[in-house]
């Protein structure tokens, strides 16, 4: 099931990015106008049996024009192996993106959530993005602008529907992306000053309800496999169904995301 969900994301990425470059080992998804956004400039390894050194070489080949390196490994077992190997190469790190499929959403109502277009919650989205970084990071405003733009492009590709809570003075948001019989809950965030009030649960439940109303057979969310939000998603009815390993090398200067 994880492969089908990944294919859903890849289809959106093909439509949202400016370029998709084919290589013998896989593909690179690029948006040269958004160089600070990692999610807009990354590569996918689709060939089995590559060594960590070969993966690094592929990253250098495909992302030579960028300060960062970000490369995902399509096959889960290959990704697990390469994540171990990459640890021996200075500057590189591995992360695990946990795919979680909705199994039992329960019967609880969404609560005080409001559906709005992105234009109606753009200021909140910008503040949520900025809150992910230290306020003194270099190029913070430019990075936030580029991430917001990439989110807009992805939303256009996936027919995004945004949900905020509370309905008055919103402090949390998420979106629902759609394609065929699949819905993805994405970009969940709550302002730091409003955390602990259950607002993330409220917007996620609203997105789940919208996904069910849209007739999606499968609704999923992606979380950091080593961070706490996955536990919240589990309480809302999502269950793990696979992992995507992403290998990264941060830039030596500046800031990216």
Predicted feature locations:
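N-terminal charged segments
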Residues: 1-66, 77-83, 156
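Conserved acetyl-CoA-binding loop-helix of GNAT-fold acetyltransferases
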Residues: 52-60, 187-192, 196-213, 231, ...
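Conserved beta-hairpin
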Residues: 20-25, 81, 85-89, 93, ...
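A conserved beta-turn-beta hairpin within the catalytic core of GNAT-like acetyltransferases
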Residues: 35-41, 178-186, 195
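A short helix-loop-beta-strand connector motif used in the catalytic cores of GNAT acetyltransferases and
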Residues: 13-21, 65-68, 95-96, 152-164, ...
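Short amphipathic alpha-helix that is part of the acyltransferase structural core
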Residues: 1-11, 42-50, 54, 97-99, ...
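Acyl-donor-binding surface of acyltransferase catalytic domains
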Residues: 48-124, 133-134, 222, 245-249
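A conserved beta-strand-loop-helix scaffold within acyl/acetyltransferase catalytic domains
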Residues: 149-191
């Amino acid at each position: 099931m994880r492969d089908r969900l990944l294919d859903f994301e890849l289809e959106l990425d093909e439509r949202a990015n400016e370029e998709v470059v084919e290589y013998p080992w896989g593909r690179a998804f690029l948006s040269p106008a958004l160089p600070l956004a990692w999610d807009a400039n990354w590569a996918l390894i689709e060939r089995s049996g590559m060594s960590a050194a070969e993966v690094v070489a592929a990253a250098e080949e495909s992302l030579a024009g960028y300060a960062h390196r970000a490369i995902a490994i399509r096959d889960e077992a290959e990704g697990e192996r390469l994540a171990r190997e990459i640890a021996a190469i200075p500057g590189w790190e591995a992360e695990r993106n946990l795919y979680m499929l909705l199994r039992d959403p329960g019967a609880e109502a969404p609560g005080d959530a409001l559906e709005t277009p992105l234009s109606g919650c753009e200021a909140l989205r910008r503040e949520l993005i900025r809150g992910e970084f230290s306020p003194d990071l270099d190029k913070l405003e430019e990075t936030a602008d580029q991430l917001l733009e990439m989110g807009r492009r992805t939303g256009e590709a996936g027919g995004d529907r945004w949900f905020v809570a509370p309905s008055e003075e919103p402090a949390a948001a998420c979106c629902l992306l759609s394609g065929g019989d699949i819905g993805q809950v994405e970009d969940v965030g709550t302002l730091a000053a409003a955390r602990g009030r259950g607002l993330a649960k409220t917007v996620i439940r609203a997105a789940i309800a919208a996904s069910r109303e849209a007739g999606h057979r499968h609704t999923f969310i992606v979380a950091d496999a080593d961070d706490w939000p996955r536990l919240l998603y589990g309480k809302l009815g999502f269950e793990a169904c696979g992992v995507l390993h992403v290998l990264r090398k941060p830039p030596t200067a500046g800031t990216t995301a």
